[in-house]
Amino acid sequence: MARKTNVFATTAGILATGGIIGIAACLLQKFGNPGNMGLCVACFGRDVAGSIGLHRAAVVQYLRPEIMGFVLGAFAAALLFREFRPSGGSSPLVRFVLGMIAMIGALVFLGCPWRVFLRLAGGDGNALAGLAGLAGGVWLGTLFFRKGYSLGRSQSQPAGSGLIMPLVMLGLVALRIFYPPVPEEAQNGLLWYSLKGPGSMHAPLVLSLGAGLGIGFLAQRTRFCTMGALRDVILFRQGYLLYGVLAFFGAALAANLLLGQFHPGFSGQPVAHAQWFWNFSGMVVAGLAFALAGGCPGRQLFLCGEGNSDAGIFAMGLLAGAALAHNFGLASSPQGTTSHGMVAVGVCLAVLLFIGFTHCPKQGGQA
């Protein structure tokens, strides 16, 4: 019945949502966001972590309004359509760790699943390895699903619990308004800002926040999720979410061609490196973490807007992972992956396998 009452949850709805996200990403790039990074939840989360002082990497510090918009837009949709249902309590510490690991893997690759497709749509051939890694990581996750993997059931919670993340995001919007970036100043009040590098590149506040709000609203209604698209095809042979991802890529490719932002090649791509093995491995780690957590980083933010505190814990893990990645030198750069990052990929994969096996009933874990 839900599919009948939700006009967005149709093939046309998911195609439109994917297309709008792809076009919005390219336009945000045109208006100032970094190259092939018009929208990237991992990279933008890293910038947010830097802006509030969780790491001191000076080139990636900016309070990205798109992130707050995703949660607040989804919150508005959930309220309007009576889908704001506060819940949580499903292995919160595990979800926090999954969030940290997902961010570390994404920063080894230099992008979340959304940026995999945006890099491809911008002509970055290195993202092919990332796409293969993402698919491989999600496929590994489906092996655990077949064995009964579960983090336990979420429980209904008081309204106050579900309001925490939207209120936090509203507070961050207020901070961005009252403490805007000041030319040639690395700090304004409570917030840090990059003077060069990706963090210094951003679209105007109104456009960024507006795009985030609109995307959050649409994605909440359609359940847009890049990880879910791959999972559903592998497990159930269902293409609903995949249609949205394909529309996202197709629209971004078309927009980049029209805007002159398509630059095919492997070297000199913006905020990217050409080490294929580590592009692949980083996204295997990220993809498996997203699968075990139940959604890509964008989907997790949209769930925060619905009052899901488990998704909120995962989002906090993303911020912590960004801080660790830059404070400990795990994040890659255009020059390539660091030695610490290489070790981190192996350690993170081992932790993910441990979580997967110990949460499968057939392996002695809890259902």
Residue ranges of model-derived segments:
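Membrane-interfacial helix-loop segments of redox and metal-homeostasis proteins
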Residues: 1-367
